[in-house]
Curated annotation (Swiss-Prot):
Keyword Repeat: yes
Provenance organism: Bacillus subtilis (strain 168)
Protein name (Swiss-Prot/TrEMBL): Uncharacterized transporter YxxF
Protein family (similarity comment): Belongs to the EamA transporter family.
Family matches, as Pfam families: EamA
PANTHER family recorded: ACYL-MALONYL CONDENSING ENZYME-RELATED, MEMBRANE PROTEIN
Bilayer topology: Multi-pass membrane protein
InterPro entries linked to this entry: EamA_dom
Origin superkingdom: Bacteria
Keywords: Cell membrane, Membrane, Repeat, Transmembrane, Transmembrane helix, Transport
Entry's transmembrane regions: 13-33, 41-61, 76-96, 103-123, 128-148, 157-177, 192-212, 218-238, 248-268, 272-292
Length: 311
């Protein structure tokens, strides 16, 4: 990502603040989701609905719809990304239901490594020693976190929440790879189309009775995940991208999981054991290694950049 030389220091400072705020908000979504008292499908449905309405209003109010360059290929690819994105959210929130936010978020951040692995398969991208090392380190870290051993059954694995976090990471990786081919539509439009698709495809799975017993506090958390964690945060995120260097973004994205882990340990009292702690460190060390390969490069997708992980 090349910075415009005409960017002023004030613009850059403002962009840094926006990016930091967006990463902090992204990092708090696990904490918010645990206080919604909604299952994953219903929570993602509300998130998609609120985000679609909010981003649609901003898109129309700003007049940006007048400058969009529509193409059938981009729209179809955006919708395909939207399918994977929506179920990425479903699986992520499902993992929050079954395990701690710390464990779920750590495993979820396998996504950049999975992009490397899948990219080598689908796009014939060569893996160097650093890439292979990062993949091995991350998967060993995942094994330590999940406590997998010779006696671990499929039922135990499914009930641990780890499998849902892995599926969320896998679907995010597919979202990233598909998003590389979207060139003409703006990030606001792609996100609007994807969340709108989410509303449509999730309706058959929604149990509306789940909303009947929500308290006022639950509703505040529910609406926040849609408007703040999806709508407002994307405005902050995308508005700051073009003013910041790839190197800075590569570093600041670690603020997202850091906030999630701090909130989980402070407010829920979760304490990972020695092996889980080692696994968490290994996953983020492996993720950091992937940045060595991609330093100086950034491809903006419907959800962010290929060097970055957001919820």
């Amino acid at each position: 990502m090349q910075q415009d030389p005409s960017i002023s220091s004030k613009q850059k400072s403002t962009a840094v603040i926006k990016m930091v705020i967006s990463m902090v908000i992204f990092g708090s979504i696990g904490f918010f989701s645990e206080h919604t008292n909604l299952p994953s499908f219903e929570l993602v449905f509300v998130r998609c609905l609120c985000a679609t309405l909010f981003l649609g209003f901003c898109w129309l109010a700003s007049g940006q719809y007048k400058t969009e360059k529509w193409s059938k290929r981009d729209v179809l690819q955006t919708l395909a990304c939207g399918f994977f994105l929506v179920f990425n959210w479903v699986f992520l929130f499902k993992s929050f239901e079954e395990t701690s936010v710390t464990i779920a978020i750590s495993v979820y951040h396998l996504a950049p490594v999975l992009v490397l692995l899948l990219g080598s398969f689908f796009y014939r991208e060569k893996l160097n020693v650093i890439s292979v090392s990062s993949i091995i380190i991350c998967f060993l870290g995942t094994a330590l976190i999940s406590g997998i051993n010779g006696s671990t059954s499929l039922t135990q694995l499914m009930g641990s929440g780890i499998i849902w976090a892995v599926l969320a990471a896998l679907f995010y990786a597919f979202t990233t790879l598909l998003g590389k081919g979207i060139h003409n539509l703006s990030p606001y439009t792609t996100t609007f189309l994807q969340t709108g698709l989410g509303v449509i495809i999730l309706i058959p799975f929604i149990h509306f009775g789940a909303f009947a017993d929500l308290s006022q506090g639950n509703w505040i958390m529910v609406v926040s995940t849609g408007i703040i964690h999806t709508g407002i945060v994307y405005l902050l995120f995308f508005d700051s991208l073009r003013f910041l260097s790839t190197k800075f973004i590569s570093i600041i994205v670690f603020l997202d999981p850091a906030v999630a882990i701090v909130l989980d340990t402070v407010f829920t009292g979760f304490r990972p054991d020695l092996y889980q702690t080692l696994g968490i460190v290994m996953i983020f060390a492996g993720m950091a290694l992937t940045l060595v390969r991609r330093q100086g490069k950034a491809n903006v997708t419907a959800e962010g950049t290929d060097i970055e992980q957001i919820q």
